[in-house]
Amino acid sequence: MKLFIDTANIEEIREAYALGIICGVTTNPSLIAREGRNFAQVVREIAAIVDGPISAEAVSPDAAGMIAEAEELSSIHPNIVVKIPMTAEGLKAVKILAQKGIRTNVTLIFSANQALLAARAGASYVSPFVGRLDDVSQDGAALIYDIMEIFERHCIRTEVIAASIRHPVHVTMAAKAGAHIATVPYKVLMQMIGHPLTEAGIKKFLEDWEKVKDK
């Protein structure tokens, strides 16, 4: 399973990419707004760091507006993938954008039926929101399993991005369920690195080395 980072913070992206663990970035209007900077400039800086897909969101409610935004976004850099919401208007936009060769990531997926419709409309990626389902006592991992089973059985090439990741367990669940990609916040990526037993083991090795290094 590939890992993307879910952020618009340049320093977080730079640090995660330096570790060799991410190959793409997802953003949304909230993440961009948090940085308080020009959107196009942020995207260009991201593209200079990560040579992989960069998801940026269209916010218009209607298909015509989404298409216009998508064309503008995709002109910023060839690695741009346009995030489109899972609505009827979104599906119309995805179909036309696919015909134009503009890649899309259909977001706010909460059912296997939604994922299937998005894929059939021509989405390059679908993003089921694992954490938000868990927040309302539904099974986010089960949704990934269902989508993957349907896509594999029907030879659907759309890639599945496990999104709305809250903690490292969500990443493990997504990997076990067969998701192609998990997009993970910086904080969770850092949590995945550490383990108390790893830290204790390093401390013990250093203590033992200090005892024998001068003998």
Curated annotation (Swiss-Prot):
Chemical reaction(s) catalysed: D-sedoheptulose 7-phosphate + D-glyceraldehyde 3-phosphate = D-erythrose 4-phosphate + beta-D-fructose 6-phosphate
Cross-referenced InterPro entries: Aldolase_TIM, TAL/FSA, Transaldolase_3B, Transaldolase_3B/F6P_aldolase, Transaldolase_AS, TSA/FSA_arc/bac
Top EC category: transferase
EC number per UniProt: 2.2.1.2
Keyword Transferase part of the UniProt annotation: yes
Family: Belongs to the transaldolase family. Type 3B subfamily.
Protein function: Transaldolase is important for the balance of metabolites in the pentose-phosphate pathway.
Record's protein name: Probable transaldolase
Species this protein is from: Pelotomaculum thermopropionicum (strain DSM 13744 / JCM 10971 / SI)
Highest classification ranks of the organism: Bacteria, Bacillati, Bacillota, Clostridia, Eubacteriales
